[in-house]
């Protein structure tokens, strides 16, 4: 299904659940740009940090902590550009979501949902190759099972290029599309440019 400009069905409270800072922009940056002037409130949740997995255990802890802070600052700047303030950072260890009990990650998400009460949630895809992304998806499903959280009306998965398409035979297959203008796309690209450490030369996907 293709949805054009009428996004009222999303409700007035929308939550983006991302494994790491930058997944929100890669997956939903165009939508966030499109919603900027709409009468809705948006909350972005980051389950983990996105930096420590690039370092060996022998590297100094203070260097890793500085990189985590830097990336979180990138996230704040990118979201502020799109008119979104106060994202939540839970800073679970990057690349190690499988070392945490799934129920613990689910509780992080559930507590955020109970606090914000979104009508619509966007999160990662089941087919994503990145294990942190996949676990975030599974934990979101766990946290949104029909129960007391009856204010959640819509649940969508989004694509993160460089991981969701890199899964032979089981790549991301969307069944719902929201159209974006060139202006929306340009704003998404500009927002991602705040992530200075994530932009590299071809053939890097970003």
Predicted segments with their positions:
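Metal-dependent de-N-acetylase/amidase catalytic core
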Residues: 1-17, 34, 38, 65-66, ...
């Amino acid at each position: 299904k293709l949805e054009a400009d009428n996004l009222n069905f999303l409700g007035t409270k929308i939550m983006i659940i991302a494994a790491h800072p930058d997944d929100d922009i890669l997956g939903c940056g165009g939508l966030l740009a499109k919603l900027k002037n709409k009468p809705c409130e948006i909350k972005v949740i980051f389950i983990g940090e996105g930096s420590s997995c690039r370092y060996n255990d022998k590297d100094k802890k203070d260097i890793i902590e500085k990189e985590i802070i830097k990336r979180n600052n990138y996230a704040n700047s990118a979201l502020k550009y799109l008119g979104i303030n106060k994202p939540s950072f839970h800073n679970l260890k990057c690349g190690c979501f499988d070392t945490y009990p799934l129920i613990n990650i689910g509780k992080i998400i559930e507590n955020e949902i109970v606090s914000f009460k979104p009508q619509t949630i966007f999160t990662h895809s089941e087919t994503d190759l990145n294990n942190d992304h996949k676990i975030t998806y599974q934990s979101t499903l766990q946290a949104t099972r029909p129960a007391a959280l009856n204010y959640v009306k819509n649940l969508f998965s989004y694509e993160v290029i460089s991981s969701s398409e890199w899964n032979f035979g089981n790549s991301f297959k969307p069944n719902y599309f929201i159209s974006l203008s060139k202006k929306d796309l340009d704003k998404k690209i500009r927002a991602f440019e705040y992530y200075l450490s994530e932009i590299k030369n071809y053939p890097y996907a970003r």
